Design a protein with these regions (language model features):
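A subset of signal/propeptide-processing and intrinsically disordered low-complexity segments
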Residues: 2, 50, 62, 81, ...
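Flexible, surface-exposed loop regions and adjacent strand-edge segments
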Residues: 36-42, 76-80, 116-123
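C-terminal beta-signal and adjacent terminal beta-strands/loops
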Residues: 68-72, 90-137
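Gram-negative outer-membrane beta-barrel transporters
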Residues: 1-73, 107, 134
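Surface-exposed coil/turn segments at beta-strand junctions on protein surfaces, enriched
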Residues: 13-15, 52, 80, 92, ...
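Residues that define the transmembrane beta-barrel architecture of outer-membrane proteins
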Residues: 2-4, 41-45, 81-85, 125-129
Length: 137
């Protein structure tokens, strides 16, 4: 098999309140006979933003895009590309305790992130939320 491609990642602070992380991967994955490898997306992109609204409240927004990938080690069928939007908020209740809310798949996109075999594809989770409290001591 032969896998070629490249990956880029940028991570940084745009302002004293805005942190961003972005990445892109482009992949060409083939078996020695030239047929594509299964479950290797042609491209992937992600970006995550964290913005500090106040000294206690932070808002988060992220986007993940995954290109088409093959279900089998053959030219077809393919898992379709998808884009998922996630969001969240964190609030510092005390210096050591944070309340968090994360919402995954904000647009309730129907997507298929991977396949389990040559004839089954997994359905991505519909819109869902998680409330958490974390504490350090």
């Amino acid at each position: 098999q032969e896998i070629t491609g490249f990956e880029l990642q940028l991570v940084g602070t745009l302002t004293d309140k805005w942190f961003i992380s972005a990445g892109y991967t482009d992949t060409d994955a083939k078996k020695t006979d030239g047929s594509p490898l299964r479950e290797v997306p042609e491209s992937m992109f992600s970006i995550w933003n964290n913005y500090l609204v106040t000294d206690k409240l932070a808002l988060n927004l992220g986007v993940i895009n995954q290109g088409e990938s093959h279900i089998k080690d053959q030219a077809s069928p393919k898992l379709p590309s998808f884009t998922r939007v996630d969001a969240g908020a964190n609030y510092a209740l005390t210096e050591n305790t944070t309340l968090g809310l994360n919402i995954e798949n904000l647009t309730d996109e129907l997507y298929f992130p991977h396949s389990h075999s040559t004839h089954q594809a997994s359905v991505g989770a519909p819109i869902n939320a998680m409330l958490s409290i974390s504490s350090s001591f």
